[in-house]
């Protein structure tokens, strides 16, 4: 008889709408939240690049079953493109690969935006989690290999130029569907404008049905979870009372609010 392995942690369920800081990986954020809630199970609904900040929905327990629904939800990003340089990662982290002295005018940028609105074809960055013959594209890129990544359809519902604080940079906001790479937008727009570009700053503000009002920071979570609790020399709480921190969770069913609802007539319902 096979002995069933006992699950570690609490069977707590719900959503933490985490305000991920720059520099933290999405998987690291999940591990930290799982530890803080002492949850048996945890997962996130859409990776955010380490250099990006903002809304990262993290599901605990039974809420992990609703992750696919949230991943289908629309997302909003506010980002800054730095003109004049294209980089290997399409953001600040990579090496400079192309340089231009040209800077786009506001009129040129506005004229280009309609081409990037609606359903478009987009090629993901070389440094991405896309699998190529069983390997992650970013692993191959780190080995110096240039891989052929097929373009894919993505949908951008709205694309706004918010401001151009300097000739070097422009701030945008988009609402888009699943699978959209903002870094690819910076790369492709820079090429179309003849000046090159990369992402200088990126923040996600919504993942339907969650928004900025739902955000909570690591500092806020930690303050509630560890308030008046002794920490031993290994950084582990000596005793825990999860009542207060559990009150910060958004109910599991909230994830289903992004699903389409249909009204059936009595005849069709039968």
Swiss-Prot record:
Gene Ontology biological-process entries: mRNA pseudouridine synthesis; tRNA pseudouridine synthesis
SUPFAM superfamilies: Pseudouridine synthase
Recorded superkingdom: Bacteria
InterPro entries named among the record's database cross-references: PsdUridine_synth_cat_dom_sf, PsdUridine_synth_N, tRNA_psdUridine_synth_TruB, TruB_C
One Pfam short name: TruB_C_2
Keywords: Isomerase, tRNA processing
Function: Responsible for synthesis of pseudouridine from uracil-55 in the psi GC loop of transfer RNAs.
Name of this chain's protein: tRNA pseudouridine synthase B
